[in-house]
A protein has these predicted regions:
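Active-site neighborhood for divalent-cation/phosphate handling
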Residues: 1-101, 206, 237-239, 248
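Helical mechanochemical/support elements of P-loop NTPase systems and associated helical scaffolds
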Residues: 19, 23, 69, 141, ...
Length: 259
């Protein structure tokens, strides 16, 4: 089960107290326990106004998470000698990152697609300005590459990981590895094309790579081969942190900027 439920919803204008009361009902199809066991929060994305300039609808990014989830993170932080100050769903962390980026750089483009190439899969987050629009999950990740190397070279997955990191015997450029990169690229391209088809007034023309897989240049090369997309590192959206691998900390930096 997901640690946090998120959704974009529209509600009529109401007070903060009314919103606090009504927000749990927006998640009635997702929650598996009593609503008193959850924290609910929201961010206003847009106030829709009528002809007389009065607010007629509120577009919200809303989220819900079990209170025990927050307590688990609080306990983990305490054991490490830290104090939990802020907990954000990843969509909100990326939004905070883009809020800072837009303020600093005043970019021409308003549409962003962050592609987190992770261990178990790929997660794509599409935002317009600093407002989250949608996400897509792809069931291909670095674990698939490790397993492919493991099978081809006849070693266990732990050894295959070291072979991947060192490109032992050309593990990263083997035809099977290259085929996996192109499968990843094809799925990423399909998601971008689907978004562009359904949002013809906007157009995604570039993607920003983050996560552990962002260090694998062949993945970006494969995307460029199969799609008319500019592929950039997520570090281009981030302030200079002095990190040697900023693509690993994209969401963490978003949380820090929000805090």
């Amino acid at each position: 089960a997901p640690l946090v439920f998120t959704r974009i919803t529209e509600l009529p204008p109401m007070t903060e107290g009314q919103l606090t009361y009504n927000l749990p009902f927006e998640f009635k199809d997702y929650l598996t326990q009593e609503k008193s066991r959850y924290y609910f929060d929201y961010a206003v994305q847009e106030l829709v106004r009528g002809e007389d300039d009065s607010v007629t609808r509120m577009k919200l990014f809303a989220c819900a998470t079990l209170k025990t989830t927050i307590e688990d993170y609080r306990s983990m932080m305490n054991r490490a000698g830290f104090k939990l100050k802020l907990a954000l769903p990843e969509e909100a962390a990326y939004a905070a990152l883009l809020t800072d980026c837009i303020r600093r750089t005043q970019p021409e483009s308003r549409d962003y697609c962050l592609v987190d190439v992770g261990h178990a899969g790929i997660r794509m987050f599409i935002l317009r300005d600093d407002r989250f629009i949608t996400r897509r999950t792809i069931d291909l990740g670095m674990l698939d590459l490790i397993r492919s190397i493991s099978e081809r070279q006849g070693v266990d997955e732990h050894i295959a990981l070291t072979h991947m990191l060192s490109n032992y015997e050309g593990a990263m450029t083997d035809p099977a590895s290259m085929d996996l990169y192109h499968r990843m690229a094809a799925e990423i391209t399909k998601a971008v094309n689907f978004y562009n088809y359904n949002n013809r007034q906007q157009a995604l023309r570039r993607v920003y790579l983050c996560g552990g897989g962002a260090a694998v240049g062949h993945i970006g090369d494969a995307i460029r081969e199969v799609a008319d997309l500019e592929v950039l590192p997520a570090a281009d959206l981030m302030p200079d942190t002095g990190s040697d691998a900023p693509w690993l900390y994209t969401r963490a930096l978003g949380c820090a900027l929000q805090a």
